[in-house]
Curated annotation (Swiss-Prot):
Homopentamer. Belongs to the MscL family. It comes from the Bacteria. It comes from Staphylococcus carnosus (strain TM300). Its main location: membrane. This is Large-conductance mechanosensitive channel. It is a multi-pass membrane protein. The keyword Metal-binding does not apply. The keyword Aminoacyl-tRNA synthetase does not apply.
């Protein structure tokens, strides 16, 4: 049972998730600090009160704190959106930059040499591997 737990706990996905949770918590503290100590005082100056979040209330309902939480959430959500978008862009570039396997390069060179020797390029020769594209569940 311990061995199974160890295999589960040390899989790459679980460790990545743990790191993401810790980084997310730290990032959330930074954004909360930015909103509380920089953005909200600036908004408070615009509306004429120094402490916008705590002074805006009606019959005990502190909607100023709610507005602060909404602004905090929007900034965190937007920053995470940008981070995920950047990560997806980098992942796509890595996928595109992958070099073809050696056997693919060799087969392409052989095809090109055969085409040069024959002197003609037909549709059948350019698609020579389409019928055998999935031999033994391996892509050529």
């Amino acid at each position: 049972m311990f061995k199974e737990f160890k295999e589960f706990a040390f899989k790459g996905n679980v460790l990545d998730l743990a790191v993401a949770v810790v980084m997310g918590a730290a990032f959330n503290k930074i954004i909360t600090s930015l909103v509380t100590y920089i953005i909200m005082p600036l908004i408070g100056l615009i509306f004429g009160t120094v402490d916008f979040a705590k002074n805006w209330s009606f019959m005990g309902i502190k909607y100023g704190l709610f507005v602060q939480s909404v602004i905090d959430f929007l900034i965190v959500a937007f920053a995470l959106f940008l981070f995920v978008k950047l990560a997806n862009t980098l992942m796509r570039k890595e996928e595109v930059e992958e070099e073809p396997e050696e056997n693919i390069v060799l087969l392409t060179e052989i095809r090109d040499l055969l085409q040069q020797q024959n002197g003609t390029v037909t549709n059948e020769t350019t698609n020579i591997f389409t019928e055998t594209d999935d031999v033994d569940n391996k892509k050529f």
